[in-house]
From Swiss-Prot:
Natural source organism: Homo sapiens (Human)
Outcome after substituting Y384A: No effect on decapping activity towards NAD-capped RNAs. Loss of homodimerization
Residues that coordinate or bind Mg(2+) 3: E370, E374, E415
Assembly behavior: Homodimer. Homodimerization is essential for its catalytic activity and protein stability. Interacts (via ANK repeats) with BLMH.
Designated name of the protein: NAD-capped RNA hydrolase NUDT12
Binding annotation for Mg(2+) 2: E370
Cofactor note: Binds 3 Mg(2+) ions per subunit.
Effect in UniProt of substituting Y318A: Partial loss of decapping activity towards NAD-capped RNAs
List of residues that carry N6-succinyllysine: K185, K292
Enzyme class: hydrolase
Cofactor: Mg(2+); Zn(2+)
Catalytic activity, reaction form: a 5'-end NAD(+)-phospho-ribonucleoside in mRNA + H2O = a 5'-end phospho-adenosine-phospho-ribonucleoside in mRNA + beta-nicotinamide D-ribonucleotide + 2 H(+); NAD(+) + H2O = beta-nicotinamide D-ribonucleotide + AMP + 2 H(+); NADH + H2O = reduced beta-nicotinamide D-ribonucleotide + AMP + 2 H(+); NADPH + H2O = reduced beta-nicotinamide D-ribonucleotide + adenosine 2',5'-bisphosphate + 2 H(+)
């Protein structure tokens, strides 16, 4: 009985595929209305109805099947998708239909379970306490409080020192220089020459406030240890270094900032991004007049009384963040990933493709556009994974998995230098053996590395 059922099903599948190949939409509709599960059924050679319609040049059938939710990412035994077939046979209209159809069915190898994770630059020591930014009296009192911590920047580079025991065989830690009021009070006396940002208060209540008992009136003590970022000019920075020989300004930012402890890196990401904004917006973007710093460093106020920016809330008055999509593009069969490289990269380094989101664009559309612009590969399903602040100067890297619906690579040399498909085995070797391989990927503190590892983890049996 089971063999009879199998034979009957095979006959129906064959009729369904033949109607797609012949362009018989009436017959196709009739079969599908009685047996909707046939939509993505494959023949012995792995072909679907969508592939047969694409091969034989029937755009109306392709459109119909797409509207029914047909999976564009299925790969036949020749490793082709429906889009690959349409491109090979020169059916441009069908290729455009397949390439521009948004979304698509989630492939079997992508899980719904995406755990929230904290990437490098996203952890912090501080509670930002944004409600205190308008309290000028509180901020002023905290500036001179003996427990307050100041971190110094010059040209956006943080002042650091090497921690650890000199007799230790371990690599010394790069730590932020945590300064106090007496270290920097001369700079605070010249507000026109500095940029001061309130970063927040320490999350953990520590005993160090007890060390200053009696120095601050009890009624003024709230138990909060404030942190500020202080930007000074290069001349002042050089003078400071001469007085503090154990400290130095950490540069260039990449890869130097990746040496910091994770929670200190989060503080630097916050401070560096806001300081970078101030360095670029000394004058009002609306009228060109001079501006002044307000709200603990989180606003610039135009000094021209009739400036339109003073009426209402305007994004030009507040620190900006630039959203960037970064995506691990997965081959339609799930066994390979697409990585690319720019000319400025170290020799042999490949990473996930990335690009800025344009105005009026969704995350998903930005992923599809950027991948096609840089590599020529078409993308269907897009799934968010995680994000990472990236203070170069102030980006938010939005990490996604993207399922390719085509496989041919056509690199735009104006965008990137190279792009290639890499097998899971190749990527695993790189992650375990590092630079001993023919190529390498970014370090573990970059979200690209985490996206690549995420793809490896969800495909253990491929």
């Amino acid at each position: 009985m089971s063999s009879v059922k199998r034979s009957l099903k095979q006959e129906i599948v064959t009729q369904f595929h033949c109607s797609a190949a012949e362009g018989d939409i009436a017959k196709l509709t009739g079969i599908l209305s009685h047996s909707p599960s046939l939509l993505n059924e494959t023949s012995e050679n792995g072909w679907t109805a969508l592939m047969y319609a694409a091969r034989n040049g029937h755009p109306e059938i392709v459109q119909f099947l797409l509207e029914k939710g047909c999976d564009r990412s299925i790969v036949n035994k020749s490793r082709q998708t429906a889009l690959d077939i349409a491109v090979f046979w020169g059916y441009k209209h069908i290729a455009n239909l397949l390439a521009t159809a948004k979304g698509g069915k989630k492939p079997w190898f992508l899980t719904n379970e995406v755990e929230e994770c904290e990437n490098y630059f996203s952890k912090t020591l501080l509670d930002r306490k944004s409600e205190k930014r308008n309290n000028s009296d509180w901020l002023l009192a905290k500036e001179s409080h003996p427990a307050t911590v100041f971190i110094l920047f010059s040209d956006l580079n943080p002042l650091v020192t090497l921690g650890g025991n000199k007799e230790s065989f371990q690599q010394p830690e790069v730590r932020l220089c945590q300064l106090n009021y007496t270290d920097i009070k001369d700079y605070l006396a010249q507000p026109e020459k500095i940029t001061l940002i309130f970063l927040g208060v320490e999350l953990e209540i520590k005993d160090k406030l007890l060390n200053y008992a009696g120095e601050v009136p009890r009624e003024e003590e709230d138990g909060l240890v404030a942190w500020f970022a202080l930007g000074i000019d290069p001349i002042a920075a050089e003078e400071f270094k001469q007085r503090h020989e154990n400290c130095y300004f950490l540069h260039p930012p990449m890869p130097a900032l990746l040496q910091l402890k994770e929670k200190e890196a989060g503080v630097v990401a916050q401070a560096r991004s806001v300081l970078a904004w101030h360095s670029r917006y000394k004058f009002c973007p609306t009228c060109g007049n001079a501006t002044k710093i307000e709200e603990g460093g989180y606003k610039r106020l135009c000094l021209k009384e009739d400036c339109p920016s003073l009426n209402g809330v305007h994004n030009t008055s507040y620190p900006r963040v630039d959203p960037v999509v970064i995506m691990q593009v997965i081959h339609p069969d799930g066994t390979k990933c697409l990585l690319g490289r720019q000319k400025r990269f170290p020799p042999g380094m490949f990473t996930c493709l990335a690009g800025f989101i344009e105005p009026g664009e969704t995350i998903e559309d930005a992923v599809r556009r950027e991948v096609e612009e840089e590599s020529g590969v078409k993308v269907g399903h897009v799934q968010y994974v995680a994000c990472q602040p990236w203070p170069m100067p102030s980006s938010l890297m939005i990490g996604c998995l993207a399922l390719a619906v085509s496989t041919e690579i056509k690199v735009d040399k104006n965008e990137i230098e190279d792009a290639r498909w890499f097998t899971r085995e190749q990527v695993l070797d790189v992650l375990t053996k590092g630079k001993q391989q023919a190529f390498f990927v970014p370090p573990s503190r970059a979200i690209a590395h985490q996206l690549i590892k995420h793809w490896i983890r969800i495909n253990p049996n491929l």
